[in-house]
UniProtKB/Swiss-Prot annotation:
Record's keyword annotation contains Nucleotide-binding: yes
Protein's name in the database: Kinesin-like protein KIN-7M, chloroplastic
Sequence ranges of Polar residues compositional bias: 50-70
Example of a GO cellular component annotation carried by this entry: chloroplast
Region (Disordered): 1-92, 549-578, 824-847, 922-946
Family: Belongs to the TRAFAC class myosin-kinesin ATPase superfamily. Kinesin family. KIN-7 subfamily.
Record field: compositional bias (Low complexity): 23-49, 824-838
Targeting signal (transit peptide) range: 1-60
Bias kind Basic residues: ranges: 8-19
GO biological process, one term: microtubule-based movement
Any one GO molecular-function label of the UniProt entry: zinc ion binding
InterPro entries: Kinesin-like_fam, Kinesin_motor_CS, Kinesin_motor_dom, Kinesin_motor_dom_sf, P-loop_NTPase, Znf_RING, Znf_RING/FYVE/PHD
Domain Kinesin motor, chain residue ranges per copy: 104-421
Origin species: Arabidopsis thaliana (Mouse-ear cress)
């Protein structure tokens, strides 16, 4: 199948479901667009049926068995169940309302093929159709979505139409409102699906063709078709059929919402309807972006209003329905990189589509909450369709490329939510006499009665006095009677033309009326507005003026196709066969006359096209000549057909003379003669116009030839002037040659200087990088030196404390020794004196002496330990001093290298100045002007000096800061707090520099603090729970999901509350 994936996939888990009927998930239509307007405003009454309220007459009956737990992704929150939709029929009497059981919107997905740009970019296929009702993710197979139908990249638009739109069109012809619209991101294929082109028509042309085919197949009913075409551009409604209808307003009455002042046109054939679309497309707003050269910048709504009633005496009321074909503009992201007006347009498009998503989300919740239909013009016009008062078919166009993964996923989520909206479609019927088709039918019958009375000689509304005056006039003279008869004939002719025009506006199937005459529908290739009595030719010219040059050729091709139909159907053989079968009835005769009029209209249309091509042939006469010749051949062919029809009318008139009365025969002959005279006169006018156009074409060709001759003469004069210049003085040539050689040498020198300049710039950048590395190493060394200085100061403090303590201990030791010596001396003296006196207890004295000797040993040991500790500290201090000296040497070496780099940089700037001076000197030789380059050199030298001074000053400041830091680090411990503060200050300066760089990098993106929906207001809201800071206040209140991660918003934090 065309919609299945090109690769082998696992069978869909939904393959067990029964296939739905053509009305499966049938969509509802908006009966409230321009719509909900059953009739023109002048004919609407309060008694008309209100579609928005659901009080409609007639319905279709349908039994549905549906089990849907959820429309979310499979493997996620829920799955789809089986669906069964039996055949349905239309049931309902006048004045009754029979509603069907609940159904859902029909949702189809169409994949477009990957573009050449995506292949070149290296994109891969991420989303693919699995079977014919499933969309699955390549990298996460559990993420899948089920819909009514999924079409692959190789599918065609007719296949999409047969599934998504044809059931809606068929139901609309039976009285049920219908809406078909395409949804997707920019460049996903929405406009191609809805409009198509000449080779591959889209949904709208196929639907129009299908409508007229159904009319042709439906016997016993009369149809009246009207169309309107509008766009919503920047939340402003514009009428595309009427360029003056700008900024229209939406109104409401008992029938629902409608657009005030919208223009409605009666259409008679598919070509006629397509001509209005082509004329409207000329006024539609389009623009270019990064993805599409002609991107739609507005939403368009093409509405086909259908009225039908039973033919003849079987009238049972008028059935009214509307078919809305909508082409939505694509949602845009920051990838489009639009600015100015395009960004403003994208903001309005995103707001309307965001509101549409919010409305669909509210409708799928199933709660009695407020639905914000009035937040956008689009949702207000789609209110009745989304509320479920008709069939709705949603066609989602997506791309499988990996670069649009999130956009495709969001589109699939939108389609999944829309699938859960329930609808209750019903058949519409108008029982009153306010329908336009009924008004036309009554007027036709009244005019026919008046014509019969005129034929019988009975004037309606003529009093007895008027009859007496007529008798007196008859007696007065034959001349007055003749004038009166002529006036009556004119009145008859006017009534007949009025009847014919009103009859033409009503489309009736000709399947069983005249065999061999009409194939599909009456070939009314004309543009006629409802309620206007202008002539057919002028109306044709008006509709032709609405079309653009681009659409003229397509309309001309339609006219050629219709003329080919007439050629096949109205051949002389067929006419002779029909004449041999029997005498034509008056209705058949009138039908032939209508054919003649239609051919005259087509001839006028071709003539206007020929005029436009002649005007365009001034730019390209060769290519336009073939088209002009083809149009002339078509006009001659139509003239031949008109002559054959007139001959057929004449033959049928001769055949009917024997069976008609003399008065009727005379009237017919007079009428036919008048018509023939008119047609001959029109043919003469057309032939005269053709001759004039040919003469104009010949004059244009002669003028073109004259211009070619003038160009040739000018070229000859130019060559002669060149030859004259080549014969100038030899000295001048030599001087010029010398100058050229000098210029070439200067150019060569300039190229060399440029190369040297490039090399110097590269060397400069390398030196800068090296200088930066050295600066980093110097800063690191300085930091180490400062740390070592602090540690050295701490050690010096400790050594000082220990030396003071040692000195104190030495003093105590000396004092203790002195004290011990004095005590020992006294003890010895006392012992000697005591021994001498009485010899008392020497042992005790020995113990005291022993104790004193023990204390002295302990003090000596402690003093030695302290001396050893002092020696260790002095060694550590010496080591610290050595390390500090090494760091100082490294810092001095870094300074020397930095100074050398600065000198090299200054020399490079001098070299650059010299190069600039040399370049300016070369330019001065070429221009022979020495004053200005000298000034430029001076300015360059001044700039270089200023830059060198600035660099030196900056380096001096940096060196000064470093010297201050080192000096502070080498000071006494009294300035330790100052060193700490300086170190903290340097750390703060580094942090500020890093923050400024981060801020500059953040500000590089102009859209980083701009709302991701409207692209206008700054971001002011933090979304919870994802905590993304990406929306302004108004857009955050309107959104239900985060535009970045698509998580549901539970709460909002406003960063800048008012």
């Amino acid at each position: 199948m065309a919609s299945s994936s090109s690769r082998t996939r696992s069978r869909s888990p939904f393959s067990h479901r029964r296939p739905p009927s053509p009305y499966s998930s049938a969509s509802s239509t908006s009966s409230s667009l321009i719509n909900n307007r059953l009739l023109p405003r002048s004919s609407s009454t309060p008694t008309s049926t209100v579609y928005n309220s659901g009080g409609v007459t007639g319905s279709r009956s349908m039994s549905i068995t549906r089990t849907i737990s959820d429309s979310g992704p499979i493997g996620g929150s829920g799955t789809y169940g089986a669906q069964s939709y039996p055949s349905e029929g239309l049931i309902g009497e006048s004045g009754q309302t029979i509603t069907s059981e609940r159904d859902s919107i029909s949702v189809t997905v169409r994949f477009r093929p990957m573009s050449e740009r995506e292949y070149q970019r290296g994109d891969e296929i991420v989303w693919y159709p699995d079977a014919d009702k499933m969309v699955r993710n390549e990298y996460n197979p559990l993420t899948a979505y089920a819909f009514d139908k999924v079409f692959g990249p190789q599918s065609t638009t007719p296949e999409v139409y047969d599934v998504a739109a044809k059931p809606v069109v068929k139901a609309a012809m039976e009285g049920v409102n219908g809406t078909v619209f395409a949804y997707g991101v920019t460049s996903s294929g929405k406009t191609h699906t809805m409009h198509g082109d000449q080779d591959f028509p889209g949904i709208i042309p196929l639907a129009i063709k299908d409508v007229f085919s159904i009319i042709q197949e439906t016997t016993g009913r009369e149809f009246l078709l009207r169309v309107s075409y509008l766009e919503i551009y920047n939340e402003v409604i514009n009428d595309l059929l009427d360029p003056t209808g700008q900024n229209l307003r939406i109104r409401e009455d008992s029938q629902g919402t409608y657009v005030e002042g919208i223009k409605e046109e009666v259409v008679l054939s598919p070509g006629h309807a397509l001509s209005f679309i082509a004329a409207g497309e000329e006024h539609r707003h389009v623009g270019s972006n990064n993805f599409n050269l002609m991107s739609s910048r507005s939403h368009t709504i093409f509405t086909l209003m259908i009225e039908s009633s039973a033919h003849g005496d079987q009238y049972d009321g008028v059935i009214f329905s509307q078919l809305n074909l909508i082409d939505l503009a694509g949602s845009e992201s920051s990838k489009t990189e639009t600015t100015g007006l395009r960004r403003k347009e994208g903001a309005y498009i995103n707001k309307s589509l965001l509101t549409l998503g919010t409305v669909i989300g509210k409708l799928t919740e199933g709660k009695t909450t407020h639905v914000p239909f009035r937040d956008s013009k689009l949702t207000r016009l789609l209110q009745s369709s989304l509320s479920g008062h008709g069939h709705v078919s949603l066609i989602c166009t997506v791309t499988p490329a990996s670069s649009s993964t999130e956009e495709t996923h969001n589109t699939l989520k939108f389609a999944s939510r829309a699938k859960r909206i329930e609808i209750n479609a019903s058949r519409n019927k108008i029982i009153d006499e306010k329908s336009l088709i009924k008004k036309y039918q009554k007027e036709i019958s009244t005019l026919k009665v008046e014509l019969d009375q005129l034929r019988r000689g009975v004037l309606v509304g003529v009093s007895h006095e008027e009859l007496l005056s007529l008798k007196q006039q008859l007696q007065e003279g034959q001349v007055k009677m003749q004038s009166r008869l002529e006036e009556e004939e004119e009145a008859k002719a006017a009534l007949m033309s009025r009847i014919q025009k009103l009859t033409k506006l009503i489309l009736v199937s000709t399947k069983n009326s005249i065999p061999g005459y009409l194939g599909d529908t009456p070939a009314h290739s004309r543009s006629i507005s409802a309620g206007k009595d202008d002539k057919l030719d002028s109306l044709l010219l008006d509709s032709d003026n609405l079309a653009s040059p681009s659409s003229t050729l397509s309309l001309a091709s339609d006219a050629r196709r219709s003329s080919s139909k007439f050629k096949d159907e109205n051949s002389p053989v067929g006419s002779r066969a029909e004449l041999t079968q029997g005498v034509m009835t008056p209705d058949e005769m009138d039908l032939l006359v209508e054919q003649v009029k239609m051919l005259a209209g087509e001839i006028a249309f071709g003539t206007s096209t020929l005029k436009r091509l002649v005007d365009q042939s001034m730019n390209d006469p060769e290519n336009s000549k073939t088209q002009i010749q083809n149009l002339e051949n078509d006009i001659q062919e139509k003239q031949r057909q008109m002559k054959s029809l007139e001959q057929r009318i004449t033959e049928s008139g001769e055949a009917s003379i024997a069976n008609a009365s003399s008065i009727e025969m005379q009237e017919k002959v007079m009428r036919l003669m008048t018509q023939c005279n008119e047609k001959s006169f029109e043919l003469e006018i057309i032939s005269a116009d053709n001759r004039i156009l040919q003469e104009q074409l010949q004059t244009k060709c002669t003028e073109n030839n004259e211009l070619h001759e003038k160009v040739h003469l000018l070229e000859q004069r130019l060559s002669s002037q060149k030859a004259t210049l080549s014969c100038c003085d030899v000295v001048t040539e030599e001087y010029v040659d010398e100058l050229k050689k000098k210029v070439q040498s200067q150019e060569i020198e300039n190229e060399k200087l440029k190369l040297e300049h490039v090399q110097s710039v590269e060397e400069k950048s390398g030196l800068r990088v090296q200088n930066q590395k050295l600066a980093e190493e110097a800063s690191y060394a300085k930091e180490l030196a400062s740390a070592a200085a602090i540690e050295l100061k701490n050690l010096a403090d400790e050594v000082t404390k220990l030396s003071l303590q040692n000195a104190k201990l030495e003093k105590e030791l000396v004092a203790a020794r002195d004290l011990a010596a004095a005590a020992q001396k006294r003890n010895n003296n006392s012992m000697n004196s005591a021994a001498n006196r009485n010899g008392t207890r020497p042992g005790r004295k020995a113990r005291i002496s022993d104790s004193w000797n023990l204390n002295q040993e302990n003090l000596t040991m402690e003093l030695q330990a302290r001396k050893q500790r002092e020696a260790v500290l002095e060694a550590a201090l010496a080591e610290k001093e050595y390390i500090e000296e090494e760091f100082r040497k490294k810092a001095e070496e870094a300074k020397r290298r930095e100074e050398a780099l600065e000198n090299d940089l200054a020399n490079m700037w001098v070299l650059v100045a010299k190069l600039k001076k040399a370049n300016s000197g070369a330019l001065s030789i070429q221009k022979s002007d020495e004053a200005e380059p000298a000034k430029e050199d001076e300015v360059t030298e001044l700039d270089n000096k200023n830059e060198q001074n600035a660099i030196l000053k900056e380096r001096q400041l940096v060196n000064g800061h470093e010297e201050v830091i080192v000096a502070k680090a080498e000071e006494t411990p009294k300035e330790e707090p100052l060193v700490a503060r300086l170190k903290a200050r340097m750390q703060e300066m580094k942090e500020k520099e890093m923050k400024s760089q981060a801020a500059a990098a953040a500000n590089a993106d102009a859209n980083s603090h701009i709302c991701k929906v409207c692209f206008e207001s700054p971001t002011a809201t933090i979304l919870l729970p994802c905590r993304h800071f990406c929306l302004c206040k108004s857009c955050s209140l309107a959104c239900s999901e985060c535009p970045i991660c698509r998580t549901k918003i539970s709460d909002r934090l406003f960063a800048f509350p008012s």
